[in-house]
Amino acid sequence: MKSLLFMILTFFVIDAGIAQTLKGIVYEIDENQNKIPLIGTNIFWEGTQIGTTSDEQGLFELEKIESDPLHLIVSYIGYQPDTVEVPLEQDNIEIILFVNRELKEVVVTGTSLSKYFDELDAKPTEIITSKELLKAACCNLSESFTTNASVDVQFQDAVTGAKQIQLLGLAGIYTQIMLENIPTLKGVTNTFGLGYVPGPWMTAISVSKGAGSVANGYESITGQINLDYKKPDDIERYYFNAFQSSHFKTDLNANAAVQISENLSTLLLAHTDFVTKTFDDNMDSFADQPEVKQFNFMNRWHYQSFAGYESQFGIQIINENRNAGQISETHSGGHSVHPYDINIDTDRYELYAKNGFVFNDEPYTSMGLILNGQYQNQNSLFGLREYNSHLRSFYSKLVFETKTADEVHSITLGGSYVFDQYDEKFNGFNYFRKESRPGIFAEYNYSPIPQLAVVPGARVDFHNLYGTFFTPRLHVKYGIDENTTLRISGGKGFRSVNLLAENMNYLASSRQFAVINNPTYEEGWNYGFNLTRYFSINNRDFRVTADFYRTDFLKQTVVDIDSDVRQVRFYDLDGKSYSNNYQVEIAYELFERLDMMAALRYSDVKTQYGDKLLTKPLANRYKVLLTVSYATEERDWLFDTSFLLNGDGRVPSTIENPVEYQRPESFSEFMNINAQVTKKIDVVDLYFGVENLLDFKQDNPIIASDDPFGEYFDASLVWGPIDGRKFYLGLRLSVL
């Protein structure tokens, strides 16, 4: 750790030297042919991380590098990026950016958008930028969706602090999570994996509903979440973030980028977070949050040959220790009983390499090779229950892409190979599984006019345990007019079941695991549509988005906690299992620098449990979200607030328990309010905020907390917040 800190400090004192300066201005041309300065345009030298952004007048200054000719890359959300050749002797330049031909409905009024829909993608993809992520504490991925209506995040139990996302009303195991299009956070990583992604490392999150691209595998049933991390050639050179909450959580992040040569650059990212003090506000003898110590390190490299070859490669190392459970002894018959302790130790290593080749004689043809290896070792103890897991995973993909010069036709072909080895031990039993699955895929994109794109795709995978999987998918995008876009999608998905790893929350209970049918894989169809419409009100865009998605399972492993209060049963679906998800969202700039977003989402999710078709337990039926953001004229003060109304839902029956251990069979709606104030001082941001302002907490979330080793103990029936109101403050330093 000392060596790491020394390296980071060394990078901060590297002198860039003295160089000539290029001065310039970036603007657009409005309807009256007036020049309008663009604020916050990204400007950097090609193949380097040396860059800057334009100021309030569209002006910028940038030191020249030793290259002749110089190539300047200029980009701005909603506009066509440009690469400008700058003669070495030129010291001043004017740059004009033009609105993207397929983004005519997006009006950018002097500031970059913090959240927007990718109008070029046939899939309905929402881009959450780093600007949006900064509107909340966002210490890790689980805290990155507080201003997003599509994705829910909730606690999995009342003791470990584990969180899980939900998309289209279904658990996160049906959503494929990727790191820059490489599958990650799967299998045994699923339970605590959201905490392994530091918020300050991310530059954007892409959320796609429905069936994803076949090029990324067959796992996405409800959607895909793709994470973009900071890169060695980004314009940010140094970054530091410090965060402290009133619940005794400390979060520290630092990263430094170094241009080693014209072709090679590297980025070091370091993260640590720790909670060293517990508390018990509801007086049930259990800590309301776990003690956590995490160390997270990543080293990324980027090589650019400028001759058609590009490579990115890196390594990530994670060590986490998590302690939870009782913080005071219980008493039985006048004698003290040893506290119920939970200990979870995790070591995780991940390597990746992405290689791209562009053929000089075929400028519209490219080939890519992606390699990824993961290893994770986790040892855990829940009271008297011991659970240990090991994951060894290898992923490779070779992809070939070509398109016609007019971009009417393009095709993507490729093959992949995935190897996963799971070794799980639970209460003396060993669950060992090796999965080997080569696959091939093809995806065709037909776009005869800019308003229309039809993308059919299919893949075939050969699973060593479960046979052949055929995965067809289709995406269609049609621009009804310049302000209205309709997207339709449909497709099949598969996933292997990891019975223990995906249900660790039930280890924090006395429920016995009853496996009626050995789990294998799950199979489902997803289909739906997304309609986006822009209206012009007071020369500002009023966006309305409506979508509907349905998921039908053909094969599913049912997790039943209704049939027996002392068991969690696993068996094959015999009947219906589906999800209908409806969502409407509006977004508008009420007046200059005051942005508003409001959304309503309703989910109808039912599964056959024995002879009963029941609503999914412990999940809200609807969600209402309102976010308001305001910036002062100088944009040195930022104010962000979110109001979230969580709807009611069903609680599994506890009628078999003694009266004192019974719970109502439903929960009521509740409100959650978050707010944050940010002060910008040159390269420093100071921020202060509050989460769960109304201090709402689920009453008595742990059943039989006074007898944790008894037969009725259950900490898994969680539907609301466990800890109450939380204040936090922090500091961010970013040097370009």
List where the protein language model places each region:
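Short, acidic, small-residue-rich periplasmic hinge/interaction motif at the N-terminus
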Residues: 31-34, 39-46, 73-79, 89-134, ...
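Short acidic/polar hinge/loop motifs at secondary-structure boundaries
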Residues: 60-63, 164, 182-209, 297, ...
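A beta-strand signature from Gram-negative outer-membrane beta-barrel systems
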Residues: 93-95, 196-237
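Extracytoplasmic beta-strand/coil segments of soluble accessory domains associated
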Residues: 142-183
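Flexible loop and strand-edge segments within Gram-negative outer membrane beta-barrel domains
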Residues: 274-296, 302-367, 373-392
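Membrane-embedded beta-barrel scaffold of Gram-negative outer-membrane proteins
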Residues: 366-380, 479, 487, 520-572, ...
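Gram-negative outer-membrane beta-barrel transporters
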Residues: 447-450, 548-552, 572-654, 732-734
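C-terminal beta-signal and adjacent terminal beta-strands/loops
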Residues: 596, 645-654, 678-736
